[in-house]
A protein has these predicted regions:
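Glycine-rich nucleotide phosphate-binding loop and flanking beta-alpha elements
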Residues: 30, 111-112, 171
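Alpha-helical scaffold segments in soluble metabolic enzymes
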Residues: 21-28, 96, 116, 141-148, ...
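Active-site-adjacent beta-strand anchor residues
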Residues: 12, 107, 167
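A generic local structural motif
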Residues: 33-37, 90-93, 175
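Phosphate/diphosphate ligand-binding glycine-rich loop within oxidoreductases
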Residues: 41-147
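Positively charged, low-complexity intrinsically disordered leader regions
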Residues: 1-60
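Glycine-rich phosphate/diphosphate-binding loop of Rossmann-like nucleotide-binding domains
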Residues: 52-64, 148-182
């Protein structure tokens, strides 16, 4: 997968090699996350967080990561604060917002809505959760954590048994995690 300029809509986009590259990159970024190294690699770049459903961890983690790498973050956390409330289409909202952003992370209550938004965007869009459909970034984080925990015990993720507990029918993160575990 070519990452530069690409949307992240579904965990199905990633092959095993892609996931391994993401994890290698994540490992290289740990010193920046821990603040033992500083960088301004994203200086001048703007992330727009568009979260139309409640979020603490996803919204804050994307924003914090972008800030740590030197970028700026714009937050929209309520649909009522946008022209969508007045009937503007996702297409039009996407066209406008992508003119002011370098990348957009979006969470929306309707399955498929983030993909619709991304199709109209002029900048990359990351799915931060769309209804009960998918949450690819959470699945990648969960898999990364499982892998690191197993490795700390001298084991690998190959042939590991993973138990999933919680809302298995409507939990978008679980849906994405099940796909990537296969």
């Amino acid at each position: 997968m070519e990452f530069l300029g690409s949307n992240i809509i579904s965990i199905n986009q990633f092959k095993k090699d892609d996931v391994e590259l993401i994890f290698e990159t994540a490992n290289k970024l740990i010193p920046f996350a821990n603040r033992s190294k500083l960088t301004k690699v994203l200086d001048g770049a703007i992330l727009s967080n568009m979260f139309f459903e409640p979020s603490t961890r996803t919204r804050i983690s994307f924003g914090s990561a972008f800030n740590i790498l030197g970028g700026s973050v714009r937050e929209t956390t309520e649909m009522d604060s946008t022209s969508l409330k007045k009937g503007e289409s996702l297409y039009d909202t996407s066209r406008v917002l992508s003119g002011y952003s370098d990348i957009i992370v979006m969470r929306h209550p309707l399955a498929g809505s983030v993909e619709e938004f991304a199709n109209a965007s002029r900048v990359p869009v990351i799915n931060g959760g769309d209804g009960d459909n998918e949450h690819p970034s959470q699945a990648l984080l969960d898999l990364y954590t499982i892998k690191k925990e197993l490795e700390s015990r001298g084991k690998t993720i190959d042939n590991a048994r993973v138990a999933l507990i919680g809302d298995l029918k409507y939990g978008r993160a679980v849906h994405s995690l099940c796909k990537i575990l296969n």
